[in-house]
């Protein structure tokens, strides 16, 4: 198993399990490849983070204030601004994982966000917790390959 801790990027969207951005610290045997938050040896930079991101876009409508999302697709969250309120919200991005993934998460925020997420991807099960907003945040993840 690998443990990862990340700061930066879209950490605030912790509702999207297993996705982090920034610096990551891994504690694992040197030969083991990555989970959802880092790409092994001792320290790695992320988005090596998304070897198989644990989550997806929400089939439900995206709200600018809060949302509950559940997905089974291969997408990782990205951020976009909603013109009406200029608030970042999570949207589906191009696929970056070859493995099927499933995720369950809740996020809330207007200009910033906080959330909690649980994700599973065939190649890398992961747990993710995040706080923060667009351009900054803190995320904690665990996964194994």
Swiss-Prot record:
This is Cuticle protein 65. Sequence repeats lie at residues 27-30, 33-37, 39-42, 86-89, 92-95, 98-101, 123-126. Component of the cuticle of migratory locust which contains more than 100 different structural proteins. The keyword Lipoprotein does not apply. The tetrapeptide (A-A-P-[AV]) repeats found throughout the protein are also present in many proteins constituting the protective envelope of other species. GO terms for molecular function: structural constituent of cuticle. Keywords: Cuticle, Repeat. The keyword Repeat applies.
